[in-house]
Amino acid sequence: MDTLKVRDAKDVEEVVRAAIASEQPLEVIGHGTRRAIGHPMATNAVLDVSDLNAVTAYEPNELIITVQAGVPLADVQSLIDSKNQQFAFEPMNTSVLLGTSGNGTIGGMIGAGLAGPRRIRAGGARDHLLGAHAVSGFGDSFKTGGRVVKNVTGYDLCKLLAGSWGTLAVMTEVTLKVMPKPESERTLMLSGLDDVTANKAMTAALGSPYDVSGAAHLPNSAFRSATGALAGLAAQGPAVTLLRLEGIAASVADRATSLARTLAPFGSVEMLQDTASAAAWGAIRDVEPFAAGGALGNWPVWRIVCPPAAGGALGQAMARETGGDVIYDWGGGLIWAALPPKSDAQAALVRQRVEAAGGHAALIRAPEETRRKVAVFHPQAGGVAALSQRVRHSFDPKIILNRGRMLLIAAT
Amino acid sequence: MAIMMPAADQAVLDRRGEIVTALRAIVPGEGVIDSAAEMQVYESDGLTAYRQPPMVVVLPDTTEQVSQVLKYCFEQGIKVVPRGSGTSLSGGALPLSDGVLLGLGKFKRIREIDFDNRVVVTEPGVTNLAISQAVAHAGFYYAPDPSSQIACSIGGNVAENSGGVHCLKYGMTTNNVLGCEIVLMSGEILRIGGKAAENSGYDLMGIITGSEGLLGVITEITVRILQKPETARALMVGFAEVEAAGECVARIIGAGIIPGGMEMMDKPAIHAAEAFVHAGYPLDVDALLIIELDGPGVEVDELIKRVETIAQGCGSTTCQISTSEAERNLFWAGRKAAFPAVGRISPDYLCMDGTIPRGALPKALARIRDLSEKYQLGVANVFHAGDGNLHPLILYDANKPGEIERAEAFGADILRACVEFGGVLTGEHGVGIEKRDLMPEMFSEVDLNQQQRLKCAFDSQGLLNPGKVFPTLHRCAELGRVHVHGGKLAFPDIPRF
Amino acid sequence: MKTEFSLAQLADPDIAVADKILRACVHCGFCTATCPTYVLLGDELDSPRGRIYLIKEMLEKDRPPTAEVVKHIDRCLSCLACMTTCPSGVHYMHLVDQARVRIERDYSRPLAERALRAVLALVLPRPGLFRASMIMARLARPFAALLPASNAAATPGLLRRIKAMLALAPNSLPAPGPSGGSVFAAIGERRGRVALLQGCAQQVLAPRINQAAINLLTRHGIEVVLVRDEQCCGALTHHLGHDGDALARARANVTVWQKEAEQGGLDAILVTASGCGTVIKDYGFMLREDRDFAQGAARISALAKDITEYLAGLSLAPSRQKGDVTVAYHSACSLQHGQKITGLPKELLSKNGFVVKDVPESHLCCGSAGTYNILQPDIASRLRDRKIANIATVKPDMIAAGNIGCMVQIAGGTSVPVVHTIELLDWATGGPKPGSIGQD
C-alpha cells in the first residue's frame, strides 16, 4: 500500500483529487497512533500529513494557537505549557490504552475528540476548535470558523470536524483555544463507596458552587492492575472517589474545606496535592488501569457516555453481568469498561444496557477481527443515521476519506 | 428595502387561499393568521430596517403540528421562515412574501428540570431568562445571557448560537446545549443527543446550533445548567482614553484571569444607559469597563485586588466595586439595556456585531471613529471586551432621507474592517440578512459551497429560510457534483514510501 | 421606529403625542417578556410590541379600527408591565388610551357587546346602581350554571361574560359606609389633613377598607375628609374608551378637590384603590389640552398619593404584631407598574411586624384589570389561576393587596383571607383583625 507523504495543503488537494479520479479510498494519518480505533478501513493508500507540522502562530494573550494539523500534540503541549497555558479539555493520551508510541498529532486529537476529566467544566475538543483549513472529499481546500471565539459566521463546520475520525475532510491547519493553567490543584478522595453511592457523591460535588473540575470513581477492582500514579492509591484498598479543585491556592484551600463539608455524608476525605493530584488525573485521563501494557491489556475496552446521574447504576450492573471492570469519569457520565475477551466483546448486552440508561457506547479497543464484525461506534436511530450519512456525503460523496472506519458496512 | 430576497413564487401566491385552508386544518383555532392587518406585526424582528409581511403566519401548539406544516410545505414547495421571539438583530426572522412565517411562541413549557444531571429540557419558546428563573430556587442558572435574555427565546438562542456578557467564561449557547428535537423540512422529527455530555457520531447538535433556522425547526432543547457561583462582584472602571481600557483588557487576560464578564462602553453609550438606569455611571470618562469576577468568596477577593492593580497600572480614573448583589445588578442593568436605551438619544439605531482579536480593539475603535466622521452619523460603542466582540450602535433617523442607507454603508465598512483586522463578520447576532452580502469578504466561493452542501443534507429543496446567511442559492444537485481533475492516477512529485 | 405621519396629522396634539411615543419604540421586544397576554398566548399580536405596531398603522393610515385591531387591543389589560420593562421609555399607556378612544368613536361593536359595555359604564361608577346590581346578581347566581363555560373562542360571547360577572358578585353586601361630606377629626394633635377618595365599586364591596384607612389616619393625627360631590375617578370609563365620560368626571373631581383644598386645606388626596390612583395621577396629562382645567388637573395629580406613599412619611405607632402572620404581598399592576410603587407597601408591612413574602411572577397581572375579568373572562381566569398557584407556593396566612379589583379577583379562587394592606396596618396599630373580603 502506498503511503503519500504530503508537504502542504496543495499536495493534499492533489492526492485527494487523484484518489477521487481513480476511486481509491485513502486512509488519513498523522502519526498513525490511533489507527486501531474504528473499523479496519477499506482503503488503498495512506495519506500521511505528518510533514505539515509547523506552528503557524501562537498568541498567548489572545488565547489562541494556530498550527498545521500534523504537528505532534506533545510538542504543542510543551510549547503552550512554557507560557503557562494548556488545552483545557485535557486531551487523552491514547498511547497508554492502545500501546502505541507517542500521542500523535493535533489533527488526530481533533479527529478523535477524546477529552479528559476536565470536560465536565471546560467542554470537549469541539469546544476549543475555533477554525480550520481542510481539504474536503471533493478535493477542494476550504476554511471554516476563524481565529476568535465569538464567531457565528456561517455554519459551525468545526463542530463536525471534531470527533469525525477523519471521515469528512483532511485538516491542514487549525486554530485552537488555549486557556491559562491553574495555579494549583488539590484532589479530595473518598474511599470505600460502592458505584451507586459514589455517583451520588459526585453528583453532590458537581451540584455545588465549588467549581469541581474533575469527578472520577475507581472501584477497587480497578486497582488490580494499578501502575504508576494509581499504585499509591491502590494501597487504600477499597474504591476511591476523586474530586478535583483547581485555581489560585487560597481559593482551592477554601473550597476544599467547603467541599469536604458537603461530602461529609459520604465519609471523611483525604487530600492529594499538586503533583500527586496531577499524576492521578493523568492516569484517569489515560485509563491506566486498562493499559495495553497492563494486566488487562488484552481485554476489549468500551467507552460509554451516559447521563451522569445514571452512570453508577449502569456501570455496576454491567460489570456484574459481563464480568468486566469499570472506571468512572465525568461525574459518572463517562464509563470505561474492560471486559473479559469474547469475540463480540459482548456488544449486544453492553449496548442494550447503555441505551436503556440513555447513553451510547463505542468499542475503543478490540482485536481487529472483533472490529470487523462488531459495530465500533454506537449504531444510530434510523433518521439520525440517514442524516449523518447525508452530512458525510456533503463533504465526501465518494467516501474517499477513511472509508469504512465509522460504519460497520463500508458505505458506497 | 436594499437587500434582495429570493424571487417570489407566483404559483404559490396564486394558491394562497387553498394553502391557508390546508394550514387551518393542521393548526386549528387562532393559530393561522392571514389578514393583512394582523400579519403586518410579523413583518420584522429586531432589525426594523427590513420589513416584509409573510404570505401567512402559523403558530403551532405541538411538535406534531410543526411536522405536518413542514411536510405540507415541503410537498407543495412552499418556503418557511421560523421565528422565536422576534428579537433577532440580524433579520433572521424576516418573512418571505411567498412564505409561511412559522412562529414557535406557543411552545412555552419547561418540560423537565433534572438537577441530578444538571440539565433542563425545554420547549423553544421559553425565554432565556425564564430557564434561569425556573432553577434559581436550587441555586442553579443557565449561563449564556444575551442582553435580550428577558425576551429572547431559547430556540432562537440555539439558532443564532447566542452569546452574552458571561460567555467569556461560560461559553456560548453551543457550549451549553446537549441535545434537541428538530423537525426537518420534510416533516421528519429527529432526536439529537440528550442528557449525556456528548453524542455519538457526528456532532449534529454542534452544526444545528448557529444554523439560523436553515437546517430545521427546533421543538425541544436540552440545556446544561450550572450551580451559581458562591459570589459575584463587579468592578466599574473608567478610563480617560479607550486605548487605555483596551490595554487593561489585554493585561487582565494576559495575567491568566478569565473574568465572568468583561464589557466596555464608550461615552455616548454610557450616557444613554445612565439616563435609563441611574446606576451612577461616570459621565466624564471616555471608556467604562465593567468587569465581573465570580467564584468562591476567597477567590473573588483575591482577583478583585489583582484586577484593580492592573487597572490602576493602565491609568484608570475611576473605580467602583460592587458591595452587594443589588449593586452588582445595577452596574449591569445599564449595559444590558444599552441597546434599547440608545432609543432615548436617537429614534433609530443599527446595532452592528463583529469580532476582532482583543489586541486590535484600539485600532478598530479608531477606524470606527473615522467612519463616523465619513458618514456623518453618531455611534455609541458597547462591547464584550473580553472576547473582542464589538457592538457599535450606529445612530440614525429613519425619517430623514438617506440616513438609513448611510447607516448601512457605515455598518458594512465596520464589518469589513473586522475581517481586515483578523476577525469575523458576526460574533453572536448571526448573519441573517444583515450581513449576508458580506459573506464573500470572509469566505471564498469554495468555502461557501461547502457550507451550502451541508444545507442540502438537511433541506434538499432549499425551502427553509432561503435568502438568509448565504448570498447566492445553488441547487443541491449542482453543488453535489464532484469535479474529477485531470484523471491522473498519481502525482510523481509527492514523496511516497 | 420610523413613523409616517403627515404634517397635517401632526398638528393634532394627540397624534403629536403618539408620534413621540412611537418613535421611542425600537422594536426590541423586551416588553413581550412581561406581557400577561403574550405569556399566555405566544402571539405577537397580543403583545405590547404588536399592539404598538397595530396602533401605529391605524393612526398613520387614519383608518377606522378593524375587528382584528379591536380584538387585540381589547385583550390588553393595561397592566403596564411593559412600561416597567421597556428600556426606551415608550409611554404605552398614553398610546393605548388613545387607541381605545378611537375604537369607541370609530368602531361599531356588535349590539350585544355595545349594550354590555354601556351597562358597565353606566352602573359601575354609580354606587347606588352598583349596589342594586350586586343584589340582583346574587339572586341570579344560581342560574349561572346554565351559562356557557370557558371555550377557546376568539372573542367571548355575551352569555360567557355575564357568567363571569355573576361569579364576581359577593355572597353578601356589607352596610354602606359614611357618605360624602363627612369629616373625621384627628385624635389628639392634628398634624395634617387629607381627602380620602371614596371610590365607586370599593365603597359598595368593601367599605371597611376606607374605614381602616380613616381609623389609621385619625389615630395618627390626620384629619380625613370625604369630599362632597366627589365622583368615580373615571378609570372604568376611561379604559372602556368612553373619553367623554371619563374627562367629565375628571373635571368634576378636580373642581371639588380644588374647592376643598382652598377651603380646608389638603396635604394630599389619598387613594386606597391603586387602579384609581394611577388615573388620578394622570389627570394632568388627560386634561393638558383643556385650557380651563389643565393647571388645576396638574396640581391635583401632584396632590394624589397612594395611601402607602403617604404612610411612609408618617411615623406609625409601635406595632402590636408579633411576627407570626405570614403575608403574601400581591403587587397590584396599577401600583407597581402604573405608579412605580414596589417596595414601599412591603416595607411598611414588614416594619409593622408582618412576615412578608414575595409572590413568584409578581410582575404578572391577576387578571382583574378593571372590567377585564368581565369582558375577557377566559384570559382573566387563566391569569387568576396562575396568580393563585404562585401565591400558594409561599404558603401565606393572608394575602394583602392595594387594589379592590385584585382583591375580588384573587378571593374568588382561594380560601386564604384576602385583605387590603391598609387593613393590616390598621390592625397592627390598634385596629381590629380583618376578615377576608366578601365575608363581612
Where do the protein language model's features map onto the residues?
Chain B
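Noncatalytic alpha-helical scaffold of FAD-dependent oxidoreductases
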Residues: 1-497
